[in-house]
Amino acid sequence: MNADLKRVRENTLDDSPSPSAKRRLNSNASSPIQPSDDEGMAEWMKIVEVKRKEAIYRQMLEYRRISEHETKRANDLEAQRRVLEASFHAVELCWTQIVAAVRDLAGAENLQLKEEEVLEPLLDPSTPVPELEKALRSRLPTTRQLVTRFVDLVAHNATRPASEADLQARCLKLEAEASALRSNSKLLESEISALKGSRDEAQRDLQRIRKALDRERMEHGKAQEEWKEERTRGGQATPNLRANGSGHSTPNGKVEADKKFYSGAGPSMAGVLQDTSELEQLAASRLKQLEQLRFEQTQLQQEVDRLKILANHPSETALRESPFFQVYLHQLSTSINRAESLQTRFTATESKLDQLRDSNGEFREAVLAEARGQTETLRAQMAKKDSDIARLRGQRDELNSEIMERRAKEVEKCKYTEQIENLANSRQERISFLTSEVRRLKGKLAAAHSSDGYLSFLKESGIDGDYVKDLEAKVVTSQDQINALTSQLERVSSDTAAAKSETEVRTELESAKRLLARYERILGPNPEAAEDVRYLSQQLEKKEKERASLEMKLEEAEAATNALYSEVEGLSKLWEALDQTVKSKVLELRDGEQKITRLATEKAKADNKYFAAMRAKEAVDMEAKAAQRSVEKQLRLLERAQEVETSLRSQITANEKGLTALKNNALDLQNQLATVVAEKTQLELRLQQSQNALVEAQQIMHQRVAEAIAEKEARAKLQDEADGQMKIIKKLKERQDAVAAASQTGMSDHEWAITQERDKLLKLLKCSCCEQNFKQQVIVKCMHTFCKQCLEQRIASRQRKCPACGLAFAKEDIQTLYWQ
């Protein structure tokens, strides 16, 4: 911020010294002549311009903070949108699970649902609201059908319906809960509105404090720059400058440095211009060389990246040409030959096994029958056990989900309570700060009215007491004391009139003593004082009162400053606490998003596994049912037709031979499957290698992009510096051309400087809009001056904004500018 502020001031006051330098030069000026109104107006206008640009800069800082706040709000809305999208997907998954559960409970044939229409994903968060309503209407009949089916199931399975009294009791209970929730919601809405008001007030206070801090920072930076400038100019003496009323030798406050630059410009101007052109040519050639070297560096960097990627992830051709690959290929061929020999031995063993199987048919039949019986028994036991396990798992999952839900609710309640406590503490601290501010303002008011008694009352009782009631109590106490003393005097003296006169005499005596003491303190013990001494005493008495009032104001100002320091410190602590709260909330939001993403991924994986297991289970069930039906048919055929046993045995033998052929085919398919799996593994390895190479290339690309961005920023900074230097060079060239033209016309350096100063003063006197007429009128709001024609033209065209600062003005805000 200090660099930006420095740039603003340098652009505003390019030729004039700083305000501290002006004050120093004004204080060191030896001539008693006052500066002219024109110079004072110009300096005042420059100072006003600096203040205006500083105010614009502070407003820009405020806009930047507002922009950051709006960006944060946009990010929060985006996070809410993602949460809603996840909710949409959760609704889709829940709908799918409900349909599957109803289908399993009621049966797909009895339910008569079209799964293509029911399970079609109609809810999409990207679709507009009317289309979502249409999708919900399309699912409404299906939902009603599901609910009707559930009601039918409950009606068939229920023992007896609930009584009317129970229903009425439940209805009353639900209505009471609804009314309680409604009142609670209204209470929460009122609390939310109050919290919103306090939040807006806190935001306004924070905005005002930020503006005050920006102003203080800018003032601190300005004071630091002035201190540095005073240190740099502290050793310079100005005894030989001509004083013109402002302490400078020239009207705009410049010294004779420019004249020294142009003192020898006559004979050496051609050489300076030639050196400048040679330097420009040298800079252009260096720029071309730099661009060529940068292009070569880029090419070499790209070549290095390519070679690095090839070194980390070589190609297949290079791998095949390597000797290690040849050695591994030889080992692989040896292993393949060994596997083929083992396969031949396995085939021979299989043929022998088939022969033994054919010869041992009867034994196999008996064993198979016994195994079938045991299998059926074990299958029934396993089915019963699976149903028990599924029931227990369901109960366990329900209990776990309920426990997790309750834990999450308890954690949320604890967090909410802690946040409410933090807000209450911050509100209490804010109330204490406001109390301190009220006490400070009351003290300031008392100091402004020179009320010492009210200040002492504030120090003793604070802001909660009533000063008027305290004074009334003191008056009543004094009156009681006076009455007591009067009654005492009346008791002592029998004469009431004499006692009363004595009381009056004593009162007058005490007042005369106090007045005499005041006069003796001012005039001394001599009662014969002259008129001038009396006048002096009166003046001294006035000064004494002023001194007491100023001391009172100084004391109150110190107390107010200390209170302000404590308030600023407390507000800074509150701001730090709020900043930490915001950071913790951001981190919690990020952790929550990561957790939601991870849970969604795990849920998708679990769903895929579940559906795969269900499909496998259905396939196994279908196969088991088909096998059971075939076994029953075969048993019935065996019981009914024993006479065809021989033919059946022959058929069994034929079937066994076919089974052997199928087994051989299955072995061939297994070999093919192994080959395909090996190819798949090889392709996966290639894909992984390609992905690793791609990841490394992307990392290199990101690194190069970051380097390019850094180089671009550095280049932009250098370009800004070069633009600034070009402006300086252009200005120097213009001065060189002007000096050369002046030397050709035979004009002396002093005359040329006077001409330049005259042109500059004429430019200051002329209107900045048309640059033709002189400044005649001033806008009192911003104190910018223009000619009468330009302002009248703007008033006539209703463009009533200042051309310099854009501030709106009226016709009454224009005053005539008088030059004296």
UniProtKB/Swiss-Prot annotation:
Quote the EC number: 2.3.2.27
Region of interest (Disordered), residue spans: 1-38, 213-254
Task: Note the coiled coil stretches, chain numbering.
Answer: 68-92, 164-226, 287-738
> Looking at the keywords, is Zinc-finger present?
yes
GO terms of molecular function: ubiquitin protein ligase activity; zinc ion binding
- PROSITE patterns with a match to the protein in the record: ZF_RING_1 (PS00518), ZF_RING_2 (PS50089)
Catalytic reaction annotation: S-ubiquitinyl-[E2 ubiquitin-conjugating enzyme]-L-cysteine + [acceptor protein]-L-lysine = [E2 ubiquitin-conjugating enzyme]-L-cysteine + N(6)-ubiquitinyl-[acceptor protein]-L-lysine
Q: For bias kind Polar residues, which ranges apply?
A: 235-252
Please name the InterPro entries in this protein's record: E3_ubiquit_lig_Bre1, Znf_C3HC4_RING-type, Znf_RING, Znf_RING/FYVE/PHD, Znf_RING_CS
Q: Which Pfam families match?
A: BRE1, zf-C3HC4
Q: Record's Gene Ontology CC terms? A: HULC complex; nucleus
Keywords in UniProt for this one?
Chromatin regulator, Coiled coil, Metal-binding, Nucleus, Transferase, Ubl conjugation pathway, Zinc, Zinc-finger
Q: Where are the zinc fingers (RING-type)?
A: 767-806
Per the UniProt record, which residue ranges are transmembrane? Answer: none
Write out the biased-composition intervals (Basic and acidic residues).
Answer: 1-12, 213-233
Is Transferase included in the keywords of this UniProt record?
Answer: yes
GO BP, one annotated term? chromatin organization
Q: Which family does it belong to?
A: Belongs to the BRE1 family.
What role does it play?
A: E3 ubiquitin-protein ligase that mediates monoubiquitination of histone H2B to form H2BK123ub1. H2BK123ub1 gives a specific tag for epigenetic transcriptional activation and is also a prerequisite for H3K4me and H3K79me formation.
> PANTHER family per the record?
E3 UBIQUITIN-PROTEIN LIGASE BRE1, RING FINGER PROTEIN-RELATED
Q: What is this protein called?
A: E3 ubiquitin-protein ligase BRE1
Query: From which source organism is this entry?
Result: Cryptococcus neoformans var. neoformans serotype D (strain B-3501A) (Filobasidiella neoformans)
Gene encoding this polypeptide?
A: BRE1
